[in-house]
């Protein structure tokens, strides 16, 4: 697990020019009176920083260093929990219940605390992906119960989709069929949280 307890509020035209400039500035580490600074050159500039809808590797190389999902891969490629501190799977393998860490926060591009990260943010993220026809939708569209019907317009009520915020720190996801590798999909941006208030403020 990463030794951090915050999530930067990135994506959807969120990062400041200063942060982007630091990412595209040199390729070496340097020190200053303010401490250590690390600069890195990315091979390709991202078209945008929307980690929910973009399927581009350049976007996820950057936002993957700023946003946490329920799981991540360690340096050996092993799947480890990130924002999920515990989880259970029903006997039939269809329902996953995740208990979230209670110390994760959203921060804006100025470093100011914006809000707590809650289970609702994960629901909002998947709804946002469906409503905006994410390039990565194919990864989860046939997996989550009711999501394909919502995306196709057969059902217009997202509450019928199998992703629920049971409470602020409990998320439940119901699948169409058992997928032993399901948790590995939760390392991908399309399953990451997004703050509803922030999205609404951006129109």
Regions found by a protein language model. Name each.
Residues 86-138:
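Aromatic- and charge-enriched surface segment that lines or borders ligand/interaction sites
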Residues 121, 130-197:
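Surface-exposed binding/hinge segments that line
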């Amino acid at each position: 697990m990463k030794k951090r307890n915050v999530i930067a509020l990135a994506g959807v035209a969120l990062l400041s020019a200063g942060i982007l400039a630091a990412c595209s500035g040199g390729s070496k580490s340097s020190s200053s009176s303010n401490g250590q600074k690390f600069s890195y050159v990315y091979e390709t500039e991202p078209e945008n920083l929307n980690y929910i809808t973009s399927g581009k590797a350049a976007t996820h190389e950057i936002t993957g260093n700023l946003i946490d999902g329920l799981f991540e891969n360690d340096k050996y490629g092993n799947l480890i929990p990130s924002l999920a501190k515990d989880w259970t799977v029903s006997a039939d393998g269809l329902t996953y219940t995740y208990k979230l860490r209670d110390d994760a926060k959203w921060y804006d591009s100025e470093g100011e605390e914006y809000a707590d990260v809650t289970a609702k943010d994960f629901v909002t993220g998947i709804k946002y992906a469906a409503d905006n026809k994410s390039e990565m939708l194919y990864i989860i569209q046939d997996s989550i119960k009711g999501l394909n019907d919502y995306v196709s317009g057969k059902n217009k009520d997202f509450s019928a989709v199998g992703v629920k915020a049971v409470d602020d720190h409990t998320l439940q996801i119901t699948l169409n069929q058992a997928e032993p590798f399901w948790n590995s999909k939760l390392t991908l941006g399309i399953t990451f949280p997004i703050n509803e208030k922030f999205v609404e403020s951006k129109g």
